[in-house]
Amino acid sequence: MLNIGPFSFHSRLLLGTGKFPDFDVQQKAIDVSEAEVLTFAVRRMDIFDAKQPNLLEKLDVKKYTLLPNTAGAKNAEEAVRIAKLAKASGLCDMIKVEVIGDDRTLLPDPVETLKASEMLLEEGFIVLPYTSDDVVLARKLQELGVHAIMPGASPIGSGLGIVNPLNLSFIIEQATVPVIVDAGIGSPADAAFAMELGADGVLLNTAVSGAKDPIKMAQAMKLSIEAGRLGFEAGRIGRKRCATASSPLEGMSVVE
């Protein structure tokens, strides 16, 4: 089970809802992924205008936990305003904090992310900050009392996969809250690797919505995350420089 604050989920796959070709493909991909948590950008959806069609109208929202995010925020104050808008609309108190500090790389602003997380915790939100693979920043966020850490594998939408597995492993080893690898996942192998490192979950979007067949990719991601978690729990063998025979040598007959 993936436990985040008061919530418990069977699926360790969190799925973003943007960039799908159409609502039908989106719905089918969500269904086969078996994701229980769906994230969306509040600023890209007019949640107060009943005339504007959006995700919330198309989905049976009772089946899912919705995770609004603060994408588009440039500072802590903007992130808090967006989070409060989501809460005022009757959505979940759980919020993904996303404060971008650089438009080219879309990497998060560490100072504003810390500030926004602290402010939202004081407001009673369940806070999941998107952060870089900075080990010290992850620890400081954890010390604030956030409910999960969401380090990026690589820049948002890049599909580069996990570019710094060492840092991710350090973040996971020191964590006392769930670690959900977020951003940059490009393939099922990337998702499985994140889980093999010991991540508690993976959040992805473009890897599915941008695939040639988003529905098949959603299923592939589901299976790879399950396989990666099983592999982590099973415990991989150690790496060795030299070969070790897989068959015992004792009792073998000698051919003369």
UniProtKB/Swiss-Prot annotation:
InterPro entries in UniProt: Aldolase_TIM (IPR013785), Thiazole_synthase_ThiG (IPR033983), ThiG (IPR008867)
GO CC, any one term: cytoplasm
Keyword Transit peptide belongs to the record: no
Pathway annotation from the record: Cofactor biosynthesis; thiamine diphosphate biosynthesis
Annotated GO MF terms: thiazole synthase activity
Domain of life per record: Bacteria
Enzyme class: transferase
Keyword vocabulary terms for this entry: Cytoplasm, Schiff base, Thiamine biosynthesis, Transferase
Subcellular location: Cytoplasm
EC number: 2.8.1.10
Residues annotated as the enzyme's active site: K96
An individual GO BP term: thiamine diphosphate biosynthetic process
Reactions catalysed, as given in the entry: [ThiS sulfur-carrier protein]-C-terminal-Gly-aminoethanethioate + 2-iminoacetate + 1-deoxy-D-xylulose 5-phosphate = [ThiS sulfur-carrier protein]-C-terminal Gly-Gly + 2-[(2R,5Z)-2-carboxy-4-methylthiazol-5(2H)-ylidene]ethyl phosphate + 2 H2O + H(+)
PANTHER family per UniProt: THIAZOLE SYNTHASE
Entry function: Catalyzes the rearrangement of 1-deoxy-D-xylulose 5-phosphate (DXP) to produce the thiazole phosphate moiety of thiamine. Sulfur is provided by the thiocarboxylate moiety of the carrier protein ThiS. In vitro, sulfur can be provided by H(2)S.
Protein name: Thiazole synthase
